[in-house]
């Protein structure tokens, strides 16, 4: 049996068998690339990979999938998104073009609080259908694992709806979803002037309930002058620790409050944004093993001019991840490949750094380096076949999706198997 690439057969679902006639990049290290390679999938997991000429005899009778000379990489990992929310905020785009700052939009009643109103008003099915439409292009581009935050409810029931929708998306689309509780995202209107009281609600009511329901994989906060203070953020981190949950942090996006160092003290999975990060913060992250998650979409959309300290991150050996930061206000982007290009062009990352940023390092930012971001025997079959001459093209093109086939959790993504990457 030979299952050709893009065969047009809608009944192709299982990825079990031999994937051959491909070139293999098992992780982001170009020195580990294998030309004329093969990969064997059994019961949805990788059973063998290497040069096709060395394929063990025991596997040679398995069904075959002709990869057509494509490049195979691990599935991509989008490690920072706000995918579930109500409505959109195109009106704020016009305000920003007219010169309004992030802080000015927030103080005028826009920003996060605007999305809070729309999210609170939406039922679960509405949130699901809207989020599914945003997820589709990411999946078609090869995303096989994604983090989804709450943070647009800012009350227990609305936060619960967001996290339940995130779980539903994973089940419905066969994608690995890692949920993050971001109750400390902004101050809801009913708590105006009472930030400490709201943090009480986050730590003592919302987080315990949502953790008990199994809806939370990690906990995040927005540590900024328009968000929450270091002391308030630390309270959230301490509450997370009581529930055995790892933390991450929106830090040093608009100013340097020392959030990255605080995150490192709590052994955070990641500190994200980091445009105003200083060397002390970099050193703290390096010592703690905290991943730096760069979000070039927000940098571009906000027309920022303060670059993250790439040279310092390299100097101190801090792993660098890249993500879409998909959200309605500052990064309404649904292309992780575009973020790779922007990370290279705007932040001057190398192509191998960009590839690591959406595979191995992004998996580490999720606390799942043993599950995502690398092709290895025993792992779930999450991989992408790309119609490119070299993996460098993944960061080179923008406005084009070269994905030919996406396999998630051992299943062939039907849209890409039939239509060459278009959802």
Swiss-Prot record:
Catalytic activity: 4-imidazolone-5-propanoate + H2O = N-formimidoyl-L-glutamate
Record keyword Cytoplasm present: yes
One GO-annotated biological process of the protein: L-histidine catabolic process to glutamate and formamide
Co-factor: note: Binds 1 zinc or iron ion per subunit.
Binding site for N-formimidoyl-L-glutamate: 152, 327, 329
CDD domains the record matches: Imidazolone-5PH (cd01296)
Subcellular compartments: Cytoplasm
GO cellular component: cytoplasm
Role: Catalyzes the hydrolytic cleavage of the carbon-nitrogen bond in imidazolone-5-propanoate to yield N-formimidoyl-L-glutamate. It is the third step in the universal histidine degradation pathway.
Family per record: Belongs to the metallo-dependent hydrolases superfamily. HutI family.
Protein name according to UniProt: Imidazolonepropionase
Organism: Cupriavidus pinatubonensis (strain JMP 134 / LMG 1197)
The gene coding this protein: hutI
